[in-house]
Amino acid sequence: MSGSDLEQMYQEVILEAAKNPHGKEHFAPDLASENASHAAETTVQASHEYCTPGESHQFNPTCGDEATIHAEVSDAEPYTIERLVWDGHGCSISQASLSVMVDLVEGKTVDEAMKLAETFHKLMESRGKGLNDEQAEESLEDGIVFLGVSQYPMRIKCALLGWEGMKDAVAKALAAKA
């Protein structure tokens, strides 16, 4: 795929995510948000103290991105991510990355989802060079458009916010089953 094709696809994915973000639901106000200014020094600290099982609150102080990710995992092995939703606000990169992530991991086994998260993280570490692994890049589907973001260290955190939240939310959902 040429650079201009990737740039056009990037624009389309970002615009689509802005208009119709996948997996976004407006959660009822929770204790994390309400207690952020009262019970803890930071929103992140308060959020982690009050999240429910299968839920993770992430905050990027550099950009102001904030998202709460909720994961529901099947009761039997191999554990599958049955439902993945999020609520939050932030820049178009964080919102688009969350939307693409939901499309990629919902319905996958936990192992498959963690492998995709690892692949996306490696893409962000590539500094615009890609993965040199066509199969890995193809596994990211629309997520490959974030290759351009990997050239900007301050924006990498925006793209990774939801992925880190997904990993944490899934881990909490699995821990609640133990």
Give a label for each model feature.
Residues 97-109:
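Alpha-helical support elements that line or immediately flank enzyme active sites
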Residues 20-88:
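Structured beta-strand/loop patches that form or line metal/cofactor-binding pockets in enzymes
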Residues 93-98, 158-161:
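Catalytic-loop motifs flanking and including active-site residues across diverse enzymes
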Residues 8, 12, 61-65, 91-95:
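Alpha-helix initiation and capping sites
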Residues 87-90, 94, 155:
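Short, conserved glycine- and acidic-residue-centered signature motifs
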Residues 1-47, 108-178:
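C-terminal binding/interaction regions
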Residues 64, 88-90, 107, 148:
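Glycine-centered flexibility sites
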